[in-house]
């Protein structure tokens, strides 16, 4: 079945119009893309509005677009920006849905098998399903993704074939529809009505699709669909009446019965062939292990059409040949889609590296009888497979890599900022007395309520420098690879909010950090040639001071290295061009002011939801928070649960107000569990 996609124009909605270098860059990019050039490079200086340029480019060329970022944080930032710029179009967010993921692995040296362990983020899983739903049902789609988009995903044809289209007046037997939902990997649950489940009440079926927040009610009269409604799953309030609706599967790995039977047959055939090889090599333990694990999976697939780790059998389900590339998100796009690779100097090498890292782990599992050889074909795409699937690519970076520069026919430059801000002045200073000099520079900027970034070469130096500054009375923090993602975001928000003034880091102060309050970037040991002090790294680090009117970069070095020369020359070239443009057009640089977004927004929504729920139940009087041990929660009655929820909500909002975000996040999760428990009690009729 070929998808029928609705057509709606891409449209940018903004109070601003393209300015600076943006109009020229947009026109040249659109011209090259429309002319069919496969690779186009945008060299855009930090803070010149590359994201907005990409949005206006999409509006010009009217193509479904995949935007690739090199980590989840940047992808989330881009998705937010594009949703604001294109509110009438489908802007989707597609990243790995694991909050925590430990892949299965085997360590032969210690004979240790590590079971797959993971924690799935339900909201991110919904967004992934929302992405594929949008791609198969409409053309005006922008997907912001990480390298997750090159990993195996179910076959789009099977996903489409499993979809059920419902409309008022349609003839279908109720039991047939129920069986259809089960085959689509939805579960019947008349008590816990949540995403991925459906419930049946007489001639009424209600289902919450994996990609939706609202439920669908199907009212039947005999074998005819009498009415279709979209409703709030908690309150049951009807949001709107519908004439027709399509429900997509609850899993990307769904397959029809005939397909699954064929797959089971080829899995059994491969198992026999592999067992013969292992036994011939005298690997009897491995053969027995493989036989037990695979037969268990086959039995699960025969009984329920699914098994844990079914993606490892995707080659059989898809009917692919050995070594053939898996289906992935790219296959869900129309043929004429566009790819925009953000921070391409980092993202391009990342895409190319995914395959080897994945296959080396799986080869060990196959050799020791934990998986069939076909599991090797559940993998990310190789670089050449990625480029074969992508019709046209726009590479965006302030420092494009050699690969991108070699692919594009000259770069499109975007150097002039809409705000008139110019690249920071660079000052090279000797290393002797560098710490005392830096301390003096910090004090000057703190008096002006400005922020400072300091980048070092080692974690030890970052820690010692942080301690030294703290003893000198400086409000300082440091950022390194051991700091988890949530804490990194919090640290950056706290820096912008003025909770502290100086952030010390190593390699984390480069791409994508949007910190307009930073007026000084200090680079220690700038003359130590290497990855952290290459011209690319230096230019990216310099860019962190480019969003402030009085931005400066101080490089502490005794020798002017080639990398430093290239970085300084390129920055001076851009700065000269920017100053000339401002002078010609009479522009005064204006400081960039961006909203400081953080976890408090999520917590505020959680607090509002709690307030509404308690008001709906009449509320509960406040009392000290009881012990929250598991057995305490289980024994708590409805009134006690309400009291706990109310107190936890207050504690969560108080923690957020005190900027204790990790505590607030833990309280939010505990609050969510308790509210689910109370709602389930209510649905089950256990509340008076």
Swiss-Prot record:
Annotated UVR domain residues: 642-677
Keywords, comma-separated and alphabetical: ATP-binding, Cytoplasm, DNA damage, DNA excision, DNA repair, Excision nuclease, Helicase, Hydrolase, Nucleotide-binding, SOS response
Domain Helicase ATP-binding: 31-188
Highest rank taxon of the organism: Bacteria
Single annotated GO MF: ATP binding
SUPFAM superfamilies found in the cross-reference section: C-terminal UvrC-binding domain of UvrB, P-loop containing nucleoside triphosphate hydrolases
NCBIfam families membership: PRK05298.1, uvrb
The family this protein is said to belong to: Belongs to the UvrB family.
Role summary: The UvrABC repair system catalyzes the recognition and processing of DNA lesions. A damage recognition complex composed of 2 UvrA and 2 UvrB subunits scans DNA for abnormalities. Upon binding of the UvrA(2)B(2) complex to a putative damaged site, the DNA wraps around one UvrB monomer. DNA wrap is dependent on ATP binding by UvrB and probably causes local melting of the DNA helix, facilitating insertion of UvrB beta-hairpin between the DNA strands. Then UvrB probes one DNA strand for the presence of a lesion.
Domains (record comment): The beta-hairpin motif is involved in DNA binding.
Protein name: UvrABC system protein B
Organism: Clavibacter sepedonicus
């Amino acid at each position: 079945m070929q998808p029928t996609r609705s057509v709606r124009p891409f449209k940018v909605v903004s109070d601003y119009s393209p300015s600076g270098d943006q109009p020229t860059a947009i026109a040249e990019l659109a011209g090259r893309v429309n002319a069919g050039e496969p690779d186009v490079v945008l060299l855009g200086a930090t803070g010149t509005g590359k994201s907005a340029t990409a949005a206006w480019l999409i509006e010009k060329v009217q193509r479904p677009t995949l935007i690739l970022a090199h980590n989840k944080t940047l992808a989330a930032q881009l998705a937010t920006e594009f949703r604001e710029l294109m509110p009438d179009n489908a802007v989707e967010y597609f990243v790995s849905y694991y909050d925590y993921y430990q892949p299965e692995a085997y360590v032969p040296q210690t004979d240790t098998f590590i079971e797959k362990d993971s924690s799935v983020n339900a909201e991110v899983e919904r967004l992934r399903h929302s992405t594929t739903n949008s791609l198969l049902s409409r053309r005006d789609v922008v997907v912001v993704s990480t390298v997750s988009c090159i990993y195996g995903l179910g076959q789009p044809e099977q996903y489409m074939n499993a979809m059920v289209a419902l409309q008022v007046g349609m003839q279908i037997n109720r039991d047939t529809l129920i069986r259809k939902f089960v085959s689509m990997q939805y579960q019947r649950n008349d008590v816990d009505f949540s995403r991925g489940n459906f419930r049946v009440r007489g001639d009424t079926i209600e289902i919450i699709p994996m990609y939706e927040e609202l439920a669908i009610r199907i009212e039947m009269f005999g074998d005819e669909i009498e009415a279709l409604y979209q409703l709030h799953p908690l309150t049951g309030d009807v949001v709107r009446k519908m004439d027709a609706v399509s429900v997509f599967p609850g899993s990307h790995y769904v397959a029809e019965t005939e397909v699954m039977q064929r797959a089971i047959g080829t899995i059994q055939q491969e198992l026999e062939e592999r067992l013969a090889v292992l036994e011939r090599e005298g690997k009897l333990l491995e053969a027995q292990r493989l036989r037990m694990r695979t037969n268990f999976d086959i039995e699960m697939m025969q009984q329920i059409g699914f098994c844990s780790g079914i993606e490892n059998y995707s080659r059989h389900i898809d009917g692919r040949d050995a070594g053939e590339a898996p289906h992935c998100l790219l296959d869900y796009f129309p043929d004429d889609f566009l790819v925009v690779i953000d921070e391409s100097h980092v993202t391009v090498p990342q895409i190319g590296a995914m395959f080897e890292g994945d296959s080396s782990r799986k080869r060990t599992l196959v050799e020791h009888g934990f998986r069939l050889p076909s599991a090797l074909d559940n993998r990310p795409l190789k670089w050449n497979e990625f480029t074969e699937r992508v019709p046209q690519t726009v590479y965006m970076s302030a420092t494009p890599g050699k690969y991108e520069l070699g692919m594009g026919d000259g770069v499109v430059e975007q150097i002039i900022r809409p705000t008139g801000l110019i690249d920071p002045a660079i000052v090279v200073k000797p290393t002797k007395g560098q710490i005392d000099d830096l301390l003096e520079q910090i004090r000057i900027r703190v008096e002006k309520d400005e922020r400072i970034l300091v980048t070092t070469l080692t974690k030890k130096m970052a820690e010692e420098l942080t301690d030294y500054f703290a003893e000198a009375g400086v409000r300082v923090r440091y950022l390194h690879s051991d700091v988890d993602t949530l804490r990194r975001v919090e640290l950056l928000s706290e820096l912008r909010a003025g909770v502290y003034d100086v952030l010390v880091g190593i390699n984390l102060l480069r791409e994508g950090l949007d910190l307009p309050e930073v007026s000084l970037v200090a680079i220690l040991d700038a003359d130590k040639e290497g990855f952290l002090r290459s011209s690319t790294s230096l230019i990216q680090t310099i860019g962190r001071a480019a969003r402030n009117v009085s931005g400066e970069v101080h490089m502490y070095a005794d020798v002017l290295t080639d990398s430093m020369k290239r970085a300084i020359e390129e920055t001076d070239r851009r700065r000269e061009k920017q100053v000339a443009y401002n002078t010609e057009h009479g522009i005064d640089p204006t400081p960039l002011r961006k909203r400081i977004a953080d976890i408090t927004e999520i917590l505020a929504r959680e607090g509002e939801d709690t307030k509404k729920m308690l008001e709906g139940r009449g509320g509960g009087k406040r009392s000290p928070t009881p012990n929250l041990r598991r057995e305490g929660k289980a024994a708590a009655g409805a009134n006690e649960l309400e009291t706990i929820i109310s107190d936890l909500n207050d504690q969560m909002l108080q923690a957020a107000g005190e900027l204790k975000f990790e505590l607030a996040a833990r309280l939010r999760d505990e609050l969510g569990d308790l509210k689910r428990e109370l709602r389930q009690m209510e649905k089950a009729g256990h509340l008076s």
